[in-house]
Amino acid sequence: MSDTRMLAAALANRSAHAVLGIVSAVDPSNHAIKVRIQPDNVETGWIPDVGGVQAGNLRVSCPSEPGTHVALLPLEGDGEHLIAIGAVFDTVVTAPVSPSDGQAIQPGSMLIRAGCGAPPTETNGKVGDVNPQAGWCQIGSDGVILGAGNARLHIAESGISLTIGDVTAAFSANGLKVSGGDIQTDQHSLTQHVHLMGSQTTGGPVG
């Protein structure tokens, strides 16, 4: 008599189930990918890449990159028809840190950051170089922060601040304040302009 536990285990192993794989090719125009299923490294055909997607009147597209670790789910239990349901972090491609404070993003917040370094396409490869000029967006309890390179825009309940290098422009209920730089038009400078008094000129602005 066969052990029913062995039969159940054999049946479970024959049933299609969620698997992990590594993206091997990308077709951005059709939002499709090929994936090498682990651990056997068998490559799929072109399958839908739905990670980070919204389809409809509002559309969001974030194609996976070669080397991305993705989770695959069989459609209607058919192991020959898979769909990528999302990407996962691993020990090589780790969660990004916030350029705002250098910490991993915490629950209740969201971070979108480009230029973190492309995933390795080989098993012994390394993550690509980080691009410090790439854009990022962080949403949290302290407002919304947009950044790229050394520029940063912070929208909070108390006001809006724009920082580029050492220059900051802060707009709040008290007005607009600029620190660390000058305010200029195409013809005049606030800190360096003077006024004519007959044939003489005044000094620079005071206060």
Language-model regions, residue ranges each:
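Structural detector for short beta-strands of small beta-barrel domains
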Residues: 15-29
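Short, structured beta-strand/loop micro-motifs enriched in basic residues and often containing a Trp
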Residues: 47-55
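Flexible glycine/proline-rich, aromatic-decorated loop/lid segments
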Residues: 39-46
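Short boundary/loop segments of OB/S1/cold-shock single-stranded nucleic-acid-binding domains
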Residues: 1-19
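Short, surface-exposed secondary-structure boundary micro-motifs
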Residues: 73-75
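Right-handed beta-helix
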Residues: 2-4, 65-68, 81-207
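Short nucleic-acid-contacting surface segments enriched for D/E, G, S/T with interspersed K/R
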Residues: 56-70
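Short aromatic-glycine-enriched beta-strand elements
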Residues: 29-35
